[in-house]
Every structure is written in C-alpha cells, then in structure tokens.
C-alpha cells in the first residue's frame, strides 16, 4: 500500500499530513509509529489526517496521531498546517475554515502575510475537566490562579493545570534553557494526578508581553514548538497577573503570538505554516 504525504512544520513542530478524503487510511498503531520514526520512516512529531466531517456546519474533520501511535485531542501548530494544506491543495477556497477536532470545533483563518490565526476556543480551567486530580496536593493562590505542588525528582514544583482541548501543566522557571526539562518533563507527563497523561510546559517570563517556552509533549517528548502549550502558558501567566495580552512566545522553532482577553473568551494563536516537501511512501518498506 502506497500513501501520498506532505511534510510540513509550524515553527519547527513538524508533521506528516495525509489526505484521508482521496485515499484510504487504514493503518495499525505500529504503522503510525513507523511513519513518524525519523530513522526508518518519514519522521515527524505528529501525523495530521484530513477527513470529511459529518456535520453540515463544519468544513473538515481534523485528526492527530502522536509519534507513539496514540490519537490525541488537539494540536495548535498542526491546525495551522492543516488549513495551509487544504488551501494549497484546492480543497477549499474559504479564507476562514471551520474544522472538527476530537473535543469540538475550531476556526482557522489565513492572513494576507501568510500567517495563520487559529481560534483555539476557551481554555478549560476546572481541574476535573483538564483532567487533573488535585486530591491531597498542596495549593497556593496567585491572583486569579490556583497552583498545585507536584513532587518532581525530589522537589516540589508548582504548576497550573490548563486544558486547550488537551491537558497541560504549566510551570514558571527562571531560566528555561538551564532548567532540566528533559529530566522533569517525563515525570510530569506520567504524574498520577493526570489520568490521561499531560503536556509539561516550562515558561520563562521576559516581560509582560514576552515569554520563552519549552514543552515536553505527551507521547512525543520535547518538540521545537507546541501551539496548545503556548496558549496554555499564556493563559496561566495572565491568570497569575504576570502577563498582558497579546504575548509573543519564543520557542526553539520560532515565534507564536497568543491573545486572550480573559475568562469566557477564546484564545487566539497566530503563527507560520510551512510546506517542506511532498512524496509517496510504500508502507511495505516500513518495519512492522
């Protein structure tokens, strides 16, 4: 079986994009993992699938498969690549596209300068809906936010749980480049307080409109950028009274701009979406 694919990235967060409307996609978990493998497959942080939606008020369905073969709820950088893909392929001529994801509907808009703005929806801040189990954990209040203390590698680290359609734990650090992200990230990802695991975000505040961010993504490890992670980090920073909208988020892969006007309002994310190359791969050549 041969698959046509497009390799894309959003601020260095890289994806395999597959048209699931004009070709059949019936892959096993092992085949998804093999596609994402950087040594034996194409290589990517995640695989994005374009499908038809069953809803009349939605243009497409958007599915995301992690490098570990598991399907996840949302990916903001991937959403920007998604709308660039369907536009460049002539699958839509709309400037604003509504897309169905696992937990709802998002709106994607192409800007005149080539950037893409994604309406990411409202953040979910109720712990049980992240989901996050807070029972027995120490807490402390900062402005409008409640922080929870997690035991991580012998230290208590204070995190803000936020869902952007997928779960995030946001931690503020003094120097994100010196912080042990690769050591603490896996511990937080698999912490028992997050029943579905979690994306661990480490944010350094530069000023009230600028941050530096690293994210250890659930099922993918540290990536060059994480769109939902950038949104969750800015929401946490604003709720803690440390940031003002809009916020420029510097990641290792590039910059994102995040805007949020507070409770009851959606988060807006703007950033790049770039096509790297296209090709065809024979699944029979991949390791089982």
From Swiss-Prot:
Q: Which family does it belong to?
A: Belongs to the diaminopimelate epimerase family.
Under the heading HAMAP family, the entry gives: DAP_epimerase
State whether it acts alone or in a complex, and with which partners, per the record.
Homodimer.
Residues annotated as binding substrate are: 13, 46, 66, 76-77, 166, 199, 217-218, 227-228
Q: Which UniProt keywords apply?
A: Amino-acid biosynthesis, Cytoplasm, Isomerase, Lysine biosynthesis
Function comment:
Catalyzes the stereoinversion of LL-2,6-diaminopimelate (L,L-DAP) to meso-diaminopimelate (meso-DAP), a precursor of L-lysine and an essential component of the bacterial peptidoglycan.
Q: Which GO terms describe its cellular component?
A: cytosol
EC class (word): isomerase
**Record EC number:** 5.1.1.7
Q: In which pathway does it act?
A: Amino-acid biosynthesis; L-lysine biosynthesis via DAP pathway; DL-2,6-diaminopimelate from LL-2,6-diaminopimelate: step 1/1
Broad class of the protein's primary localization: cytoplasm
Name of the protein? Diaminopimelate epimerase
Gene that this polypeptide is encoded by: dapF
GO biological process annotation, one example: lysine biosynthetic process via diaminopimelate
């Amino acid at each position: 079986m041969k698959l046509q694919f497009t390799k894309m990235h959003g601020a260095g967060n890289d994806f395999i994009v597959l048209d699931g409307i004009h070709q059949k996609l019936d892959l096993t978990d092992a085949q998804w993992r093999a596609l994402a493998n950087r040594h034996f497959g194409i290589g990517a942080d995640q695989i994005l699938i374009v499908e038809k939606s069953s809803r009349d008020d939605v243009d497409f369905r958007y599915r995301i498969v992690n490098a570990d073969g598991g399907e996840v709820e949302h990916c903001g950088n991937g959403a920007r690549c998604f709308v660039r893909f369907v536009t460049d392929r002539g699958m839509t001529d709309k400037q604003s596209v509504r897309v169905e994801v696992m937990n709802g509907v998002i709106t994607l808009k192409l800007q005149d300068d080539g950037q893409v703005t994604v309406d990411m929806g409202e953040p979910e801040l109720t712990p049980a809906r992240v989901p996050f189990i807070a029972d027995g954990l120490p807490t402390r209040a900062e402005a409008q936010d409640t922080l929870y203390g997690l035991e991580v590698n012998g230290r208590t680290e204070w995190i803000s749980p936020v869902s952007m359609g997928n779960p995030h734990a946001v931690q503020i650090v003094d120097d994100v480049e010196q912080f042990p992200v690769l050591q603490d990230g896996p511990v937080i990802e698999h912490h028992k307080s997050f029943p579905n695991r979690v994306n661990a975000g480490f944010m350094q505040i530069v000023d009230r409109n600028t941050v530096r961010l690293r994210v250890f993504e659930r099922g993918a490890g540290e990536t060059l950028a994480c769109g939902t992670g950038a949104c969750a980090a800015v929401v946490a920073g604003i709720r803690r009274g440390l940031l003002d909208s809009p916020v420029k988020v510097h990641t290792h892969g590039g910059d994102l701009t995040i805007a949020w006007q507070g409770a009851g309002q959606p988060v807006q994310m703007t950033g790049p979406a770039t096509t790297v190359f296209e090709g065809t791969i024979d699944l029979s050549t991949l390791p089982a």
